[in-house]
A protein has these predicted regions:
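Transmembrane helix-loop boundary segments of multi-pass membrane transporters
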Residues: 249-252, 273-277, 334-344
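"…together with the soluble PPM/PP2C metallo-phosphatase catalytic core" -> "…together
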Residues: 1-262
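Membrane-helix cytosolic exit motif
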Residues: 19, 262-277, 333, 353-361
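Alpha-helical transmembrane segments and their immediate juxtamembrane interface regions
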Residues: 87-102, 328-370
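Internal alpha-helical transmembrane segments of multi-pass membrane proteins
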Residues: 106, 171, 304-312
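Cytosolic, membrane-interface loops and tails of multi-pass inner-membrane proteins
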Residues: 19-45, 266-308
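A broadly tuned "polar low-complexity/structure-edge" signature
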Residues: 13, 17, 57-58, 62, ...
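Hydrophobic membrane-spanning alpha-helices of multi-pass integral membrane proteins
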Residues: 309-330
């Protein structure tokens, strides 16, 4: 598992370095100045998904090959791991095309993530086998397997876009993905699932190889391709963890992922209430409000350095926000009622905090006075 992590990190790290060298000679991956989500100066390549996917492909591929030739590391990685990589490819390629051209519409990207989701469910046999409430599962009867497949497709389709939404500042989505991967890997080891643990740790390692260039210097962004790598791989691992291990509550990964999931749901609701298309970008996400209303100003004569330093100060707020869900999830990973309770608590806390920020109801010491 350690050698796989080192391999994933090095491939991702070196891949980012090579892409940065290439990007200096090309402006094809810049991010438009008219985008409402833009909070940086200069041209920054949005191709972090390429080296991260390559890091996964190399480490998972080599791990599967070694497992089929005697499994010296006792990882028990089978061919379905490589099939998962292949299933991810349509969405990741679509994200990378958008990162380079900025011409692939939201509709086509959504269709590509749906295609990846359907391929993963059909080829890997993924499904959500239970809801955590036996009485409801019994009431559903023969409809439960179909509902499980539908929920798996929904998770695999939606989570990539959820990570794309929260990918607004240096290190934000990358660190959230790393924290979630390590939490999932911890529980996978608790139940003896070394295969999933290895897959998740290598995803965290590939992400760290990218984060070296992303935080705090902001030299490369993950882009849509990177968000889709995180969303698809984490969704695949979450579903497989629940499916392969009956002791794990299906609400364990739900609580871990409640921040990006609820950010997406709330954003759709907010835009519909304002008469906007859910696919239209705006600058009213939770992390953007924190940037404007809570992160104190930075005094620097250079505008680019001032924006970069303030950008970097935003992400730790959301890392801490994520840890508030990760800690109870790790403590109660098999206790469905408690996990559901913490999910509801997060939703209420998020809405209260969002409204407080919007209405300038924050305590004075939390407000941006700079």
């Amino acid at each position: 598992m350690i050698w796989m992590s080192v391999l994933a990190f090095m491939v991702s790290f070196i891949g980012c370095a090579l892409l940065l060298r290439w990007a200096r000679r090309s402006a094809t991956s810049s991010y438009g100045y008219d985008k409402p989500q833009r909070f940086h100066m200069g041209e920054v390549p949005r191709l972090g998904g390429v080296p991260m996917y390559l890091g996964l492909a190399v480490s998972w591929g080599v791990g599967t090959w070694l497992s089929m030739r005697g499994d010296p590391s006792s990882l028990r990685m089978q061919l379905w791991v490589v099939v998962c990589l292949a299933a991810m490819l349509p969405a990741v390629v679509g994200g990378i095309i958008e990162d380079v051209s900025q011409r692939l519409s939201v509709r086509y990207r959504l269709l590509l993530t749906l295609l990846s989701a359907v391929l993963a469910v059909l080829l890997c046999g993924l499904t959500v086998p239970r809801l955590g409430w036996p009485w409801l599962e019994q009431a559903l009867g023969p409809a439960m397997p179909w509902l499980g497949m539908g929920l798996a497709v929904l998770a695999l389709t939606g989570l990539p876009h959820a990570f794309n939404i929260i990918d607004g500042y240096n290190g934000l989505a990358g660190m959230v993905a790393t924290i979630i991967c390590l939490a999932l890997a911890h529980v996978a080891l608790q139940v003896g699932d070394r295969t999933l643990a290895a897959m998740l740790v290598t995803l965290a390692a590939a992400t760290c190889g990218f984060l070296v260039w992303n935080y705090p210097r902001g030299m490369m962004f993950a882009g849509d391709g990177g968000a889709y790598v995180w969303g698809l791989a984490i969704a695949l691992a979450s579903i497989a963890l629940v499916q392969r291990n009956s002791a794990v509550s299906p609400w364990f990964p739900m609580l871990l992922l409640i921040y990006p999931v609820w950010e997406t749901v709330f954003s759709i609701y907010r835009k519909l209430m304002r008469g906007m298309s859910p696919g239209m970008a705006d600058a009213l996400h939770f992390h953007q409000l924190i940037y404007r209303r809570m992160v104190r100003g930075v005094f620097d004569d250079d505008l680019a350095r001032r924006m970069l330093r303030r950008n970097n100060r935003t992400s730790p707020y959301l890392w801490a926000f994520t840890l508030l869900t990760v800690v109870p999830a790790l403590l109660f990973w098999s206790n469905t009622p408690v996990l559901v309770g913490f999910c509801l608590l997060f939703v209420v806390s998020y809405v209260v905090a969002y409204l407080a920020i919007v209405r300038f109801k924050l305590p004075g010491w939390m407000q941006n006075n700079g």
